[in-house]
Amino acid sequence: MSNYSTNGSRKIRISNSDDDSRETRFSIQPRNSHKTKEERYRDKEKERDHERHHDRERRDDRYRKVDSRDHRDRNRRSPAGSRTYCRDEPDRRRNNHSDRNRRDRSSERDRDNRSSKSKTKSPDSLRSKSSRKSQTPNHLPDDGKLFDRILDPNYKKKEKTVMEVEDVEMSPVEMLDEEEVSTFTFDDACGPVRPSNEPEEKDYKSEGDPESRPATPKTPLTPDYLENTIVSLNETLSDDEDKGPDDKYGKTPDKEQWESMTENEQKLHRDAMKKRREQRHREAVSKLPVYYPGLRGCQHISEYVILNVIAEGTYGEVFRGKNTRTDEVVALKRFKMEKEKEGFPITALREINMLLKAGAHENIVNVKEILVGSTKTEVYMAMEYVEHDVKSLIDKMRSRNQRFKTGQQKTLMSQLLSGIEHMHKLWILHRDLKTSNLLISHSGILKIADFGLAREYGEARDIEKRMKLTPIVVTLWYRSPELLLEPKTYSTPVDMWSIGCIMAEFIMMKPMFQGDSEPNQVHQIFQMMGTPTEQIWPDIKELKVWNMVEFPPVKPGQLRRIFKGEKLVNETGFDLLNGMLCLNPANRLTASEALQHDWFSEHPKAVPPEDLPVYPAKSELNAAPPENRRKNRLEALLADEEPERAALLRQFNVKAEQLKPSGFQLRG
């Protein structure tokens, strides 16, 4: 008979039996039986520790004696009265101390190894006879167990029980047998469920036969208000019932049908056509690929080859590059990432946003795409390439003692005002208009560039409700007087003042106000335009600097004396210039008003853009003008030539004055 008891992961079997031959019996010795041996072992360990400590002290004493003897001998060898200091002495003592510590650690490690070996017992077959005799009572041989049974007087009175300890891994929780799940039921109402008293639905071979299908059963989950809407599977809807109110107007009627309809029917037809058009639009949009904004979908800069550097500014540097696939030449602007830990530069975000919002306009530079490099700090913007900037063109003409003609001035100003008018209608301020930010192509098209300071503005009449914009904008020479006097807010007149300065530069071939500081710039403006008063500029008292500084009074009239006295512009042109350089921003001309000015309609007319002066661009490495422009000039020169002679000149692409007569003639 056997009894099993479970204790954690061990199972102990206790059996009652009288058969001693099949069972191995042993007695469990009391816990204090090997106490004497443990005490003896501890005493020996203490003695060994004491000996080790004594040996260590003797070794240290010997080292100290050697050190003192060496020191004494060194002092004897040194001259009398001289005190020397050996730099190597502290190092040698430190090394001796480290050697002693290393020897102590090695001795302790050897002692630990001996103790660990004493704990791990080897099998009886590998032990010596002496070690077998000195083994603990827990490892007594079978003969010892037999003697214990003989010498024990109470052995016969004890129960003949045998304890067998087996390592059996058993789960503390009783596991259930696996059962196949045949059916299950949802507790929540997630759909129509067959009632428990309803028989299972049979398979019907002919699915198309409506008579072989059973009627739709009612379920407890069907609400009362939906029972009337359930249609049996056996029923079929008629064509008239199947058509909804919109399906009746799903087809566009003919002209005769349309005329015969009433107004209500025509209205329903219009609504149906509108719904169909919106549905087609939604379907077309749904078929488009999903657009994921951000830099992750941008092309790599390796798609372009950088040809040369064009310029470097405050917020980035510009390169001339070529697309390796299309061979298109573009301008690549690399944004500066000086504080990349703070995120993408706000100036770069504004420039990209404003250029995209401005859209496609002939007089605004067009953005093609955003490119990324190998690192997060390499972000480029690909724009259309324009050969010149207006400032370099003016410098080139001034070095050759040339000026813009009146017709050329009108062409440049009309293009500039057209681009600014488009921006202001979209509520965009450029805030950095100057000749170096105006580009001009070989074909004479002017384009506004560098939107790094551009920003949207509001239309609120109340000055407190407008956006608070920073006054530190616009290059100093083109900055309006209200910006120099620190206003609370500003709007489109700041751009119009810059355009007035640019127009004066087109006429004079140099900047008009060249101040070296803000106070000096204000002084030059007031010397040219006169010191303003509260009568001509009522809102000037709200400017911060005006209330802090007292400006000397200057009478206006210097602007007229310069431009009219030197006959740089006629009266109509001066009126336009004076309207854009008005001190009071409320009375300053807008872009639309300037475009409608009489100066553009009077003689001389604006010349075509192709007739503007063009020079080889530095950004093109002194490349020649395009071929088609040379052909247009050649055609103009050949207009007065004879047809045969013109055809010959056109064939060889030469001018008439380049031909030299010769004495060769054909005899008839």
Curated annotation (Swiss-Prot):
Protein kinase domain ranges (all copies): 304-600
Subcellular localization: Nucleus; Cytoplasm
Matching SMART domains: S_TKc (SM00220)
Entry-linked Pfam families: Pkinase (PF00069)
Entry GO CC: cytoplasm; nucleus
Catalytic residues in the record: 432 (proton acceptor)
Record-listed E.C. numbers: 2.7.11.22
Stored PROSITE patterns: PROTEIN_KINASE_DOM (PS50011), PROTEIN_KINASE_ST (PS00108)
Keyword set includes Transport: no
Domain of life: Eukaryota
Acidic residues bias spans: 164-181
Similarity field: Belongs to the protein kinase superfamily. CMGC Ser/Thr protein kinase family. CDC2/CDKX subfamily.
Protein name: Cyclin-dependent kinase 11.2
Organism listed in the record: Caenorhabditis elegans
